[in-house]
């Protein structure tokens, strides 16, 4: 695979090869990714710390490597040599994967995780690929959505109780769950507590993806409602980038 990248009068070329017998979809995508990255860095003059990786879960690669019998060094080598991740970031990934595998050992047959989605946000960020809509445009759909969600939570809770499954983690994501008003959040958390047996739940997270949707009252509602963790996602610490997206 050969890539050519042009920008501001500069041109970068890069090629990567694999034996024909190894040219399956995964390996073909890999050399395309590598050749584009190497050509682009020649033109841009910068080296991203996450190398050629894209997406939101870089630890999938290191965790998969270790699950298949690779060592921590093997996982770091994969990230650094194949995807050009910096040593600092590869160590971060491998460390996260190590803790992931340790946490997985706590799971027992019949354990599961529950995700509750709130597909609404104050506004929609330009880069977002999640199923979500802004309250400004679709706020009228929020009350009926919550009514349906309450019914589904009650039904799912009964289903889990009858089948003998146990919730080990519960995550309320979105969208931006903290788009809900404090009364709406309180009612939703009450429905969760009434319907689910959380006695074996190790972590109950409410995602507060937009800090501007949080205040003291809502934080108290989340705490009193049984959540043990909140996830605040600044996306970036650069104010100009935040304003742009």
Where do the language-model regions lie?
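N-terminal [4Fe-4S]-dependent radical SAM core
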Residues: 44-47, 67-114, 163
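Conserved non-cysteine loop/helix-boundary elements of the Radical SAM core domain that shape
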Residues: 132-245
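Extended acidic/polar, glycine-enriched regions
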Residues: 16-28, 32, 36-37
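Short beta-strand motif preference
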Residues: 2-3, 116, 230-232
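Local cysteine-cluster metal-coordination motifs and their immediate loop/turn environment
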Residues: 117-132
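Amphipathic beta-strand/beta-sheet edge segments enriched in Tyr/Trp
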Residues: 1-20
């Amino acid at each position: 695979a050969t890539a050519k990248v042009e920008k501001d009068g500069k041109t970068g070329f890069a090629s990567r090869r694999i034996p024909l017998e190894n040219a399956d979809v995964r390996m073909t995508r890999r050399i395309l990714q590598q050749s584009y990255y190497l050509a682009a860095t020649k033109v841009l003059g910068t080296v991203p710390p996450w190398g050629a990786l894209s997406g939101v879960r870089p630890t999938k690669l290191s965790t998969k490597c270790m699950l298949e019998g690779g060592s921590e060094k093997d996982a770091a080598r994969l990230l650094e040599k194949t995807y050009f991740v910096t040593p600092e970031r590869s160590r971060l990934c491998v460390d996260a994967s190590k803790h992931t595998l340790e946490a997985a050992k706590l799971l027992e047959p019949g354990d599961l995780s529950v995700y509750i989605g709130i597909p609404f946000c104050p506004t929609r960020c330009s880069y977002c690929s999640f199923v979500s809509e802004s309250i400004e445009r679709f706020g009228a759909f929020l009350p009926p959505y919550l009514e349906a969600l309450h019914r589904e939570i009650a039904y799912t809770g009964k289903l889990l109780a009858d089948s003998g499954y146990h919730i080990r983690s519960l995550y309320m994501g979105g969208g931006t769950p903290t788009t809900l008003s404090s009364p709406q959040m309180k009612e939703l958390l009450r429905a969760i507590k009434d319907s689910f047996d959380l006695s074996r739940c190790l972590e109950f997270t409410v995602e507060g993806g937009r800090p501007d949707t949080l205040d003291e009252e809502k934080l108290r509602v989340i705490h009193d409602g049984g959540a043990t963790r909140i996830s605040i996602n600044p996306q970036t610490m650069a104010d100009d980038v935040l304003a742009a997206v």
